[in-house]
Amino acid sequence: MKTTIAQVGRYVNEQVTIGAWIANKRSSGKIAFLQLRDGTGFIQGVVVKAEVPEDVFALAKSITQESSLYVTGTVREDERSPSGYELSVEQIELIHQATDYPITPKQHGTEFLMDHRHLWLRSKRQHAIMKIRSQIIRSTYDFFSERGFTKLDSPILTGSSPEGTSELFHTKYFDEDAYLSQSGQLYAEAGAMALGRVFTFGPTFRAEKSKTRRHLIEFWMIEPEMAFVEHEESLEIQEQYVAHLAKAVLDHCQLELKQLGRDVTKLEAIKAPFPRITYDEALDLLKEKGFDDISWGDDFGSPHETAIAEHFDKPVFITRYPRSLKPFYMQPAPDRDDVVLCADLIAPEGYGEIIGGSERIHDYDLLKQELEKHNLPLDAYGWYLDLRKYGSVPHSGFGLGLERTVAWLSGTEHVRETIPFPRLLNRLYP
């Protein structure tokens, strides 16, 4: 019976054949232990010299790391194994013998591993992180589909910036200027006016010269937009979504969390509702904690966000930021013209902002005024203004950074490990 490592539990005490690679091995005179991986998981294959043909045992001893093979054997239960099973090997068919695999079991530096990212992905740690990333993506689609959202695809090439910033990658689009997208938000707003509730999911690009553990040049965003949804209702959807992701990782990624040494009690504590504090309250809290380097109107940096998150020890919304700190499309608060109806969701354990969102301006004249105030060309945003001319309604949206969320839920220190091939300030290869 040909199967995968993830499915061997169905075949206890039965013979199976698995296509796999050698992740590692060790052997003595009479027994060889093969650490097998096939992409679905890892299992130990045990080859006993007295129980297999001579050529099979010789091959088990000579086969090299990352060689590929078909291995046939009987599935045994083993409480010592992380998966609960091992394979008593009876036959080995070599597909390809690898030579001089560069990532040996010894310790390697980060730059070396990043240079060999195409191979580093094969390690147990990277396998676990990618599985958690995949589960978060799958659970995202489940969450929004169950709530009546429509998936909307936004363009990667755009003629303007949703954020109105200069951190853009420029290219020529025949005879015009074009930019790699920083966000699908504006297009999602158009989608929400047609379909009610939508979400986009795709890569975004920021030409930021940042080298922190939280920043990537290319990263993936989940961006819902919702018609007839005001600020407070949007916050409720955000916290339900994040709690849903945490539960999904706990429910489906126990082996991966164990492999990464993640403290699962931290994830078990992620339950809605989340605390909410205003920017003003956050500023007061920071001053109580001895931060004298920040005044009203300043944005919070990583140390500030970490201090606020540590105070609550769970995700916390910081709401009502100064208008001057936020993009042109955010709705001013009805009771204070100097703050907007927005929120950043700050993850605990030093992982920083994972969601930014707001109620959007739905008044044509106010949006036009904001575009002019930010010196943004009205002709480039004419289509966006149109959304306020033909049946405009209150609406809200937010963006969740996938890589930061994966880092937080998996307990990974740096976001470079949370995307298959990271693009960093000093790295465009492989």
Swiss-Prot record:
<comment type="similarity">
    <text>Belongs to the class-II aminoacyl-tRNA synthetase family.</text>
</comment>
<dbReference type="InterPro" id="IPR004364">
    <property type="entry name" value="Aa-tRNA-synt_II"/>
</dbReference>
<dbReference type="InterPro" id="IPR045864">
    <property type="entry name" value="aa-tRNA-synth_II/BPL/LPL"/>
</dbReference>
<keyword id="KW-0436">Ligase</keyword>
<dbReference type="GO" id="GO:0003676">
    <property type="term" value="F:nucleic acid binding"/>
</dbReference>
<dbReference type="InterPro" id="IPR006195">
    <property type="entry name" value="aa-tRNA-synth_II"/>
</dbReference>
<dbReference type="InterPro" id="IPR002312">
    <property type="entry name" value="Asp/Asn-tRNA-synth_IIb"/>
</dbReference>
<protein>
    <recommendedName>
        <fullName>Asparagine--tRNA ligase</fullName>
        <ecNumber>6.1.1.22</ecNumber>
    </recommendedName>
</protein>
<dbReference type="GO" id="GO:0006421">
    <property type="term" value="P:asparaginyl-tRNA aminoacylation"/>
</dbReference>
<keyword id="KW-0030">Aminoacyl-tRNA synthetase</keyword>
<dbReference type="Pfam" id="PF01336">
    <property type="entry name" value="tRNA_anti-codon"/>
</dbReference>
<dbReference type="GO" id="GO:0004816">
    <property type="term" value="F:asparagine-tRNA ligase activity"/>
</dbReference>
<dbReference type="InterPro" id="IPR004522">
    <property type="entry name" value="Asn-tRNA-ligase"/>
</dbReference>
<dbReference type="GO" id="GO:0005737">
    <property type="term" value="C:cytoplasm"/>
</dbReference>
<keyword id="KW-0067">ATP-binding</keyword>
<dbReference type="GO" id="GO:0140096">
    <property type="term" value="F:catalytic activity, acting on a protein"/>
</dbReference>
<comment type="subunit">
    <text>Homodimer.</text>
</comment>
<dbReference type="GO" id="GO:0005524">
    <property type="term" value="F:ATP binding"/>
</dbReference>
<keyword id="KW-0963">Cytoplasm</keyword>
<keyword id="KW-0648">Protein biosynthesis</keyword>
<keyword id="KW-0547">Nucleotide-binding</keyword>
<dbReference type="InterPro" id="IPR004365">
    <property type="entry name" value="NA-bd_OB_tRNA"/>
</dbReference>
<dbReference type="InterPro" id="IPR012340">
    <property type="entry name" value="NA-bd_OB-fold"/>
</dbReference>
<dbReference type="GO" id="GO:0016740">
    <property type="term" value="F:transferase activity"/>
</dbReference>
<dbReference type="Pfam" id="PF00152">
    <property type="entry name" value="tRNA-synt_2"/>
</dbReference>
